[in-house]
UniProtKB/Swiss-Prot annotation:
CC per GO annotation: cytoplasm
Subcellular location: Cytoplasm
Positions of disulphide bridges: none
Pfam short name (any one): Phe_tRNA-synt_N
Encoding gene (name): pheS
Enzyme Commission number(s) of this protein: 6.1.1.20
Primary enzyme class: ligase
Coiled coil start-end: none
Protein's recorded name: Phenylalanine--tRNA ligase alpha subunit
Binding-site positions, Mg(2+): E251
Provenance organism: Idiomarina loihiensis (strain ATCC BAA-735 / DSM 15497 / L2-TR)
Amino acid sequence: MQLEQIVEQAESAIAAADSPTALDEVRVEYMGKKGQLTELLKGLGKLDPSERREAGQKINEAKQQVQTSINARKELLKAAELAQKLEAERIDVTLPGRHSAVGGVHPVTQTIRRIEQFFGDLGFSVKEGPEVEDGFHNFDALNIPANHPARADHDTFYFTPSTMLRTQTSGVQIRTMENEKPPLRIISPGRVYRNDYDQTHTPMFHQVEGLMVDTDVSFTQLKGILEDFLNHFFEESLTVRFRPSYFPFTEPSAEVDVMGKDGKWLEVLGCGMVHPNVLKAVGIDSEKYTGFAFGMGVERLTMLRYGVNDLRAFFENDLRFLKQFN
């Protein structure tokens, strides 16, 4: 068969191929190991040497022409296949969108972040510590005597007589004062544990405590910072009172109340000036340095901010409840 005829047939077969598979069959038919053009190359040895070179050149040119046509047809088939696929998968952008089901930040976490942001702007750093504490950091260093009710089994979860789940994050303050020198400004958010469970108490809850130790720290500073914090947290100008109270680790001590919308006082946190015995327990000169401390229950603040009546709702993971905060 003449070379021109083979090329013409190949071109026709290529043009008729309507799929990559059919096109590959054409390639094998003409360019494969036993293809028609390949067989012509194998037959060059039978030609006279004077004709061999010219014949070989023509066959190679024919192969190149056929291969170029195959490549061009392959690109056309790919483009057609892509266009068909895009048409089949076309999205109608005029249709209404679907809302993605996304999670939200737990209201307790929102409150902690809000507290951290406020005190962070005042130069307080965030410190953390172990939730399993020893007696020294949880009680002794805080001027809590051995006969204090807080150390009783019915209030504290003990592992051994000397190790327990922490009942407040004050241990973080003690560890900070042991390892760092004044001036100090820290807050210590975290989980704490007490053996209590009712509408306003759970065995595990979150607390944020604050500590400032420096020269000439006064109750006036403490009062101003806490009043600013409460107005910022509740986003309104509140009536605040500091009611005298007692804590072993502060002297003087106070409970902080705010006036509710119903005209009744609501307790929100406790505070006071750091007791000299606490400073002495961690090696800080109580004649040179003074300090204040405060502590607040995160869940209680969250309840007051959002009008939640039962603290236990924060831990029941009811999405109908939690979605209200996001």
